[in-house]
A protein has these predicted regions:
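Conserved loop->alpha-helix
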Residues: 1-201
Length: 201
C-alpha cells in the first residue's frame, strides 16, 4: 500500500527482455535504503526489488503488467516517480494507493495558470472507472485531486513543487500515464452495479 506522495525520481538505466518478462534497472537516491523483495511504486506500478548493485536496483514486470500499464513506453533515461510502501503508523498525506494500475490514460491538454499547471487526461470510461470532482486520482503514482470531471476526461492542478519533484514536468500532449482510480470509489461503483435481492440486503 502506498500514499501517492512521491519520494524521489529514478532514472531508467537499462531494460532487458526475458521471454515475456521485462527487467528494468533503475538508478535512484534511495537505492541504498532498499532491500531485496521490497515493494516500490514505479509510476504507480507496484514492483518488487530483485537485485541491488551500488546505486542501481532491478525490478521485474510480467506480461500482464506490461499490457495494463505504460511500461511499453518507457525508455532508457526516462524519469520515474518512486515511492516505497508505507508503514503502519505513517501519516497518510495522500490517499490509499494500491499500486495496481487500472488503465492507461493520455494527456490531452496542458495549461499554465497563475504559476501552477492544469493537466487534462482522457481515459476509457467503458472499463467502468469514474472520477468525481474533489475526488482522489493517482496519475503515474502521484496522489492528486480531480478539479474537473467529465465522462471520459478529468483535470488536475499541479503546484510548482509537485511539478518539479515528479515527472509531470516531462509531460507533453500525448504522454501516456498510469491511472489508478480511488479504491473506495471502485468498490462503491461495483456494489452499486450489482443486482441485490431483498434477502441479500
Amino acid at each position: 500500500m502506498f500514499t501517492g506522495i512521491i519520494e524521489t525520481l529514478g532514472i531508467v538505466k537499462n531494460i532487458t527482455k526475458d521471454q515475456e518478462n521485462r527487467h528494468l534497472t533503475i538508478t535512484s537516491s534511495i537505492t541504498s535504503e532498499l532491500k531485496i523483495d521490497q515493494s516500490v511504486s514505479h509510476n504507480g506500478i507496484c514492483l518488487t526489488v530483485v537485485h541491488i548493485e551500488n546505486d542501481d536496483y532491478t525490478v521485474t514486470a510480467i506480461k500482464e503488467t506490461c499490457q495494463k500499464t505504460n511500461l511499453d513506453f518507457w525508455k532508457i533515461g526516462d524519469s520515474i516517480n518512486l515511492e516505497r510502501a508505507m508503514k503502519l503508523g505513517d501519516r497518510l498525506d495522500g490517499h490509499l494507493v494500491q499500486g495496481h494500475v487500472d488503465q492507461i490514460g493520455t494527456c490531452i491538454a496542458i495549461s499554465e495558470e497563475n504559476g501552477s499547471w492544469v493537466f487534462t487526461f482522457e481515459y476509457d470510461a467503458t472499463l467502468g472507472n469514474i472520477t468525481i470532482e474533489k475526488g482522489s486520482i493517482t496519475v503515474n503514482g502521484t496522489s492528486l485531486t480531480v478539479v474537473n470531471s467529465g465522462v471520459t476526461t478529468f483535470s488536475v492542478a499541479i503546484i510548482p513543487y509537485t511539478y518539479e519533484h515528479t515527472n509531470f514536468h516531462t509531460f507533453t500532449v500525448g504522454t501516456k500515464v498510469n491511472l489508478e482510480f480511488d479504491v473506495i470509489g471502485k468498490y462503491i461503483t461495483k456494489l452499486n452495479n450489482m443486482n441485490w435481492s431483498k434477502s441479500e440486503i
